Amino acid sequence: IADPGYKYNVFEYQRDFLNSYESIKQKGCLPVLCGGTGMYLESVLKGYKLMPVPENQELRNRLANHSLEELTEMLSQYKVLHNSTDVDTVKRAIRAIEIEEYYAAHPVPEREFPELNGLIIGVDIDRELRREKITHRLKQRLDEGMVDEVRRLIEQGITPDDLIYYGLEYKYLTLYVIGKL
């Protein structure tokens, strides 16, 4: 879907889903949406009205010296904070404020969104069993060369910050590879 280092976002996920959905429906087939984070799935299933938001370097510079607590307070002035990932780092909090500022100046245009009568199937798994499965999968990925994969990606020019963006596995392996863990 995207090259390593590219920060694929929920807007693009929704757009790509809609394009694929229409293509599959035109062929007379049943589309199946499988996987993704809760927010990404909800963006499709609930028809979130989204639009691409460009970076605002001037705003980022103004916010750069604020603490996470200050940024969280600023963000709470825009909206009710229901998504804690918006404020788990300074970088994410600044991006969330940047998005809210953009939406305030550029209302989201009405967009046709297909009505989806989705059948939602989820796995309700015991917490300990889930942890065991995650641990097993992580050990398997390590045995299959994930540390070398991270080294190769860095050698190919992917920045450590970009790798850390991809989640916990890459975060801690990247910190290990660059000697910060």
Predicted regions mapped to residue ranges:
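Phosphate/pyrophosphate-binding catalytic cores of soluble transferases and nucleic-acid-acting enzymes
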Residues: 1-181
